[in-house]
Regions:
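Structural motif
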Residues: 70-81
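Short secondary-structure boundary/hinge segments and terminal tails
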Residues: 69-71, 196-197
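Alpha-helical cap/lid subdomain in secreted, periplasmic
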Residues: 4-6, 10-17, 49, 79-227
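Serine-esterase "nucleophile elbow" of acetyl-processing enzymes
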Residues: 2-65, 73-74, 88-90, 209-210
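Active-site beta-alpha loop architecture of Rossmann-like, nucleotide-cofactor-dependent enzymes
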Residues: 32, 69, 105
Length: 227
């Protein structure tokens, strides 16, 4: 009897190990920061969790960090570089597909980066992900490079993001260009998401729903899944 139970458990574990894994790698809008508050949306309200609910045959892994940038570190917030941390995530989680949604923090006035430079950095991160290999993985990782939506220079973030609005409106164009150059899938989050108009950076709860709904069919197509 014990052997039968053990076999059933082993079979279930093997089946689960064969499920496609999707890594959502982003910043505070992946982490779930609530606009104009110190709080965080509940785990079931954030867009990665909504993807996990909709994609029942996929394991969605949430990897968001407040203040995360593409390459540069904040002078007083420690190591927030996505480039520095992503490799550890790839080794730990062994994803089949990685969704990269970064670039908003790189628009901060202190970094003095153009929209072109931000997009080029994001594409560089995507390309390194495509090229990542480890012994236990016999195929390349697929990547969906997502351009963040526009930001607004309002409220408490106005000074920090001085000059960022105009740059943010150009991100999708450059992200699409560089994604095409490296043979990477692309999506413009700004086509479905708008940040809180009073706060300018973070998303209200319905925007998480809009993004998840838009990404579900794209993910299914990229993973070769139907229905």
């Amino acid at each position: 009897m014990a052997n039968c139970i053990d076999l059933k458990i082993s079979a279930a574990l093997i089946e689960r190990l064969n499920v496609a894994r999707v890594l959502c790698f982003g910043d505070s809008n992946t982490w779930g920061t609530v606009p104009d508050q110190a709080g965080r949306y509940g785990i079931n309200a954030r867009w990665p969790a909504l993807l996990n609910d909709a994609l029942t045959d996929v394991d969605v892994i949430e990897e968001g960090q407040q203040g995360r940038t593409i390459i540069h570190n904040h002078s007083f917030e420690g190591h927030k570089s996505g480039q520095r941390y992503l490799k550890d995530c790839l080794e730990r989680d062994s994803p089949d597909l990685v969704l990269i949604l970064l670039g908003t923090n790189d628009l901060k006035e202190r970094f003095s980066l153009s929209a072109d430079a931000v997009a080029k950095g994001a594409a560089g991160l995507a390309e390194k992900t495509q090229q990542f290999k480890r012994a236990s993985m016999n195929k390349s990782i697929k990547v969906l490079l997502i351009a963040p939506p526009a930001v607004y220079e309002v409220g408490c973030y106005a000074k920090m993001y001085a000059g960022a609005h105009a740059k943010s409106l150009q991100l999708a164009k450059y992200y699409a260009l560089y994604a095409k150059n490296i043979g990477c899938a692309f999506f413009d989050a700004g086509s479905v998401v708008t940040p809180c108009p009073q706060e300018g950076i973070h998303w209200q709860i319905d925007q998480h729903q809009f993004l998840a709904a838009a990404l579900v069919p794209i993910i299914r197509d990229m993973l070769g899944k139907s229905g």
